[in-house]
């Protein structure tokens, strides 16, 4: 019998004559966690679709061996029956069904006569959740009553209920808090100890390094290297992913910081569902020309609510004023904000940043479509010229501007959203989690773009949950905790520990004034 549970040998997958996968080899042992690394669009998802029979046997070339035996699955149900289970980035739970019903979906336990055996399903669900160190979960409640971290564990329980021997985790931590991520990584370690193998796909290379035994890197559809994690570090992984050495993940573009041009005064946001509760409590700050201002804080601190209110996109009631060039401006709707010179790239790219049914180019010019209007028609030639320039400037990878934007990788979709906002020629640009779900190469390009914009005099407000990112690109850092401003720091030798201490402190604590800007 083979030492390997899974062997994928020489996998080739072609779309319209173009090889999306070109001879990929992947091997996984029982109890081993393999990190599958590569930039967006390099073929990671395509490879996993081949493995799980989303692309059935016969639609690709190469060989898959499962426990040493050729696997020629024609459907997902066949691969799941073999013990191969994928947990996708977009969770597949049904919100209104109970935890137990979600765990057993498609594999329900029944009584004679066909009725559901709910007591047995609840008991088994409780056993599974105890194995995942969640003994107090009420599995009879709707899964919607639990947060993202718990829902991720329900997905894992669902996979284990299918007798998973190989668990494929695709960006499993994208919506989790730091503490929830640590729980997830501990559970993966426990599963490994029980002999369950894992393929871990994530742009968060610190997680990959923490939990994976082996790293397999693919680039442009080709297998670059498979290396023991003990012989690797994060810079080496990045070099293999992008094909060049990156001496500094956070490139710095020299830029002069000028006078104050933007002020947020006494911004208060009230909870949408509980109008008596403040999500943002009387926050004021100023922003200078060419300055990059990072906003840090724990999840739920009120960062997104604050910047949404500044842009006129907060769905609840809010108060306060926005000033530009020493004058109050009306930013009560996104359209008014854009006209005033204030633009925002939202946190939820898929729901708020793009229109899925439109092409790449149409999404890029959407905010300035009136610029190309001639009476009752659009000047298509002028519009296409702008689209081509933005695609070139953003290094946006697309075969055609007429392709659906959903055909692009996450990083290229984000570049398209950025291009759309930059066509409005903003003076103040708000970026809410600009690199979430974006690979390391695209992150680098976004950081370079931010520096170049600041050098041109554009002022930038960036919200990020990654403290290393905040400290890596910001000139100044605001720290928000429980809806209140907890610190305003010049980013000179500022540490993650200092930012976290401010986020967790009482607003009147004396340490909050350390490094505080004038």
Curated annotation (Swiss-Prot):
The complex is composed of two ATP-binding proteins (XylG), two transmembrane proteins (XylH) and a solute-binding protein (XylF). It catalyses: D-xylose(out) + ATP + H2O = D-xylose(in) + ADP + phosphate + H(+). It is an enzyme of class 7 (translocase). This is Xylose import ATP-binding protein XylG. Residues 6-245, 262-507 form the ABC transporter domain. GO terms for cellular component: plasma membrane. Its main location: membrane. The gene is xylG. Part of the ABC transporter complex XylFGH involved in xylose import. Responsible for energy coupling to the transport system. It comes from the Bacteria. The lineage of its organism: Bacteria, Pseudomonadati, Pseudomonadota, Gammaproteobacteria, Pseudomonadales. Pfam families: ABC_tran (PF00005). The keyword ATP-binding applies. SUPFAM superfamilies: P-loop containing nucleoside triphosphate hydrolases. Keywords: ATP-binding, Cell inner membrane, Cell membrane, Membrane, Nucleotide-binding, Repeat, Sugar transport, Translocase, Transport. InterPro entries: AAA+_ATPase, ABC_carbohydrate_import_ATPase, ABC_transporter-like_ATP-bd, ABC_transporter-like_CS, ABC_transptr_XylG, P-loop_NTPase. Disulfide bonds: none annotated. GO terms for molecular function: ABC-type D-xylose transporter activity; ATP binding; ATP hydrolysis activity.
């Amino acid at each position: 019998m083979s030492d390997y549970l899974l062997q994928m040998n020489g996998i080739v997958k072609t779309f319209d004559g173009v090889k999306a996968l070109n001879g990929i080899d992947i091997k996984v042992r029982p109890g081993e966690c393999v990190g599958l690394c590569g930039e967006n669009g390099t073929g990671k998802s395509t490879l996993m679709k081949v493995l799980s029979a989303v692309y059935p046997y016969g639609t690709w070339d190469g060989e898959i061996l499962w426990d040493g035996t050729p696997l020629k699955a024609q459907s997902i149900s066949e691969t799941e029956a073999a013990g191969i289970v994928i947990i996708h980035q977009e969770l597949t739970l049904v919100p209104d069904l109970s935890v137990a019903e979600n765990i057993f979906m498609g594999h329900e336990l029944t009584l004679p006569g066909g009725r559901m055996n709910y007591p047995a399903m609840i008991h088994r669900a409780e056993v599974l959740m105890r194995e995942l160190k969640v003994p107090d979960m009420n599995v009879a409640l709707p899964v919607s009553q639990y947060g993202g971290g718990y829902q991720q564990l329900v997905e894992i329980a669902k996979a284990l209920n299918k007798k998973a021997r190989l668990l494929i985790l695709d960006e499993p931590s994208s919506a989790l808090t730091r503490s929830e991520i640590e729980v997830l990584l501990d559970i993966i370690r426990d599963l490994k100890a029980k002999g369950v193998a894992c393929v871990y796909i994530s742009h968060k290379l610190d997680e990959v390094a923490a939990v994976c035994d082996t790293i397999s890197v693919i680039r442009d559809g080709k297998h670059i290297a498979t290396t023991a994690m003990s012989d690797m570090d994060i810079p080496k992984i990045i070099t293999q992913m992008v094909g060049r050495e990156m001496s500094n993940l956070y490139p710095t573009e020299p830029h002069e910081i000028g006078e104050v041009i933007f002020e947020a005064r006494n911004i208060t946001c009230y909870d949408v569902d509980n109008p008596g509760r403040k999500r943002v409590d009387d926050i004021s700050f100023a922003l200078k020309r060419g300055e990059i201002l990072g906003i840090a804080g724990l999840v739920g601190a009120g960062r997104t609510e604050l910047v949404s209110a500044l842009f006129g996109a907060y769905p609840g009631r809010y108060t306060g004023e926005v000033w530009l060039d020493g004058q109050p401006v009306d930013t009560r709707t996104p359209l008014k904000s854009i006209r005033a010179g204030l633009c925002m790239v939202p946190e939820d790219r898929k729901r708020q940043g793009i229109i899925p049914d439109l092409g790449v180019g149409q999404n890029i010019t959407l905010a300035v479509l009136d610029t190309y209007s001639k009476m009752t028609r659009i000047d298509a030639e002028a519009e296409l010229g702008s689209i081509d320039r933005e695609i070139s400037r953003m290094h946006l990878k697309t075969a055609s501007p007429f392709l659906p934007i959903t055909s692009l990788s996450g990083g290229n979709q984000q570049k398209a959203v950025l291009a759309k906002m930059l066509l409005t020629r903003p003076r103040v640009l708000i970026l809410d989690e600009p690199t979430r779900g974006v690979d390391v190469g695209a992150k680098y390009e976004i950081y370079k773009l931010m520096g170049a914009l600041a050098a041109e005099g554009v002022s930038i407000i960036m919200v990020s949950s990654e403290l290393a990112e905040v400290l890596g690109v910001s000139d100044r850092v605001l720290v928000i905790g429980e809806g209140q401003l907890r610190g305003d720091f010049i980013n000179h030798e500022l540490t993650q520990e200092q930012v976290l201490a401010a986020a967790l402190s009482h607003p009147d604590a004396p340490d909050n004034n350390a490094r505080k800007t004038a």
